[in-house]
């Protein structure tokens, strides 16, 4: 199962300020089958990077992304439920073709099969994993970002299953919906950066011992609620 987080600050920061945290999240979350990031650029647009290897081993990618300055970023560390889906087309985050948002997910969506034929027949599927189905659904249902928490709740109601859902919008807002009973979502501060992250499949707060011991303002996001940062 994947790990993911959204992070935001009032003032721009270099993304590699989050790399020590990301390294520990991948190692302790056992997520080493691809990684990706989407960030808000100085041009006001979303920019993305993806690689099918591990974050730890991708020195070139870490350097490229880490050198970027942003106010908001979404990072996804992949451990797919089906290893047969490893590949570029299923590496997250998924970018909205219109540039309105970027989306990632962890867990398993129970009813993704209900939507697969619809999107496949429309020529909108490029991979095989369940996340792409929910990304396409979100593209169709997007209401301009007026109420992202409600939209993520509706997405989870439509697909069901254990799933955490993360979104970064073009205006730099980050959202993390908690819907996975096996992997809680926490919010906390790493210095001046606010973070909403999955919790390494530990139902207690061991996340803060092994991944983010320096975190302050720690809170658990209740199931079926969305953290907005």
Predicted regions and their residues:
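N-terminal segments that mediate ammonia production and transfer
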Residues: 1-229
């Amino acid at each position: 199962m994947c790990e993911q987080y959204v992070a935001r600050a009032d003032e721009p920061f270099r993304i590699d300020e989050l790399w020590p945290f990301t390294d520990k999240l991948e190692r302790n979350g056992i997520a080493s089958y691809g990684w990706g990031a989407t960030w808000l650029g100085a041009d006001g647009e979303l920019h993305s990077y993806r690689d099918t290897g591990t974050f730890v081993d991708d020195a070139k990618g870490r350097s490229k992304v880490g050198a970027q300055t942003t106010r908001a970023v979404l990072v996804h560390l992949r451990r797919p439920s089906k290893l047969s889906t490893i590949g570029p087309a299923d590496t997250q985050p998924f970018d909205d073709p219109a540039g309105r948002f970027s989306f990632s997910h962890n867990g398993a969506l129970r009813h993704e099969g209900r939507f697969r034929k619809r999107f496949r027949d429309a020529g909108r599927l490029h991979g095989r994993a369940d996340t792409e189905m929910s990304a396409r659904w979100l593209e169709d249902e997007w209401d301009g970002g007026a109420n992202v928490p409600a939209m993520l709740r509706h997405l989870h109601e439509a697909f069901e299953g254990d799933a955490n859902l993360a979104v970064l919008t073009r205006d730099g807002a980050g959202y993390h919906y908690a819907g996975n009973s096996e992997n809680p979502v926490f919010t906390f501060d790493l210095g001046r950066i606010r973070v909403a992250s999955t919790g390494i499949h530990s139902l207690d707060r061991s996340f803060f011992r092994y991944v983010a011991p320096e975190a302050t303002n720690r809170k658990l996001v209740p199931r079926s609620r969305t953290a907005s940062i």
